[in-house]
């Protein structure tokens, strides 16, 4: 038995699975593309945009050719939902870019700053006034992949410390070579030989 259009196995099993998987891929790529745009990775984002739209055109063509097949609609919508979820997980795992970690400590700000500095993080501190008295504010810009490591250091000094994390849209590379915050060219950028 051949698996061609018109064959029930193809129409109601293979085609919906193809549409679902292609849609998961194209939406996941789209999620990563948007994040790369916010990180000013223009060439990589444009390349992913091309691939994303190419996949979308292939998928929508199959859906339009099979308007009487409700499974194609469900596969299209399900692929979009799953692709959004998977794209967010991928973005979390890739942890592209830098973040600003702001720590506000009424008691142990200097010790937190020293521990982070000893671990190789660039640290800036300043005195502040909180609603309950004086505080020390500690800032560090670090790779997103290193947030967990930095927070382990911070929490070892003061487990209930107040902190906030913001995405840093762009940074310069005025950081020492061994710092966990140093910008390095990624593999995809090396392949594409992208330069700002």
Curated annotation (Swiss-Prot):
One term under GO cellular component: plasma membrane
Keywords, in A-Z order: Cell membrane, Membrane, Transmembrane, Transmembrane helix
Bilayer topology: Multi-pass membrane protein
Top-level taxon of origin: Bacteria
InterPro entries named among the record's database cross-references: DUF2179, DUF5698, N-reg_PII/ATP_PRibTrfase_C, UPF0316
Localization: Cell membrane
TM annotation in the entry: 12-32, 44-64, 70-90
Gene3D superfamilies: 3.30.70.120
Pfam families named among the record's database cross-references: DUF2179, DUF5698
Listed HAMAP family: UPF0316
Family assignment from sequence similarity: Belongs to the UPF0316 family.
Name recorded for this polypeptide: UPF0316 protein LBJ_0597
Species the sequence originates in: Leptospira borgpetersenii serovar Hardjo-bovis (strain JB197)
């Amino acid at each position: 038995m051949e698996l061609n259009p018109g064959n029930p196995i193809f129409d109601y099993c293979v085609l919906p699975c193809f549409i679902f998987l292609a849609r998961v891929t194209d939406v996941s790529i789209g999620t990563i593309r948007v994040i790369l745009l916010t990180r000013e990775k223009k060439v990589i984002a444009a390349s992913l945009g091309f691939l994303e739209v190419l996949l979308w055109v292939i998928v929508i063509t199959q859906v339009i050719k099979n308007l009487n097949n409700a499974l194609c609609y469900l596969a299209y919508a399900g692929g979009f939902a799953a692709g959004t979820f998977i794209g967010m997980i991928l973005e979390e795992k890739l942890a592209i870019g830098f973040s600003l970690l702001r720590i506000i400590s009424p008691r142990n700000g200097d010790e937190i700053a020293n521990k982070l500095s000893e671990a190789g993080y660039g640290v800036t501190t300043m005195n502040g006034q909180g609603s309950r008295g004086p505080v020390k504010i500690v800032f560090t810009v670090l790779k997103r992949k290193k947030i967990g490591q930095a927070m382990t250091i911070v929490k070892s000094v003061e487990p209930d410390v107040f902190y906030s994390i913001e995405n840093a849209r762009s940074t310069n590379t005025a950081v020492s070579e061994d710092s966990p915050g140093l910008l390095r060219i990624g593999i995809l950028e090396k392949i594409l030989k992208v330069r700002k």
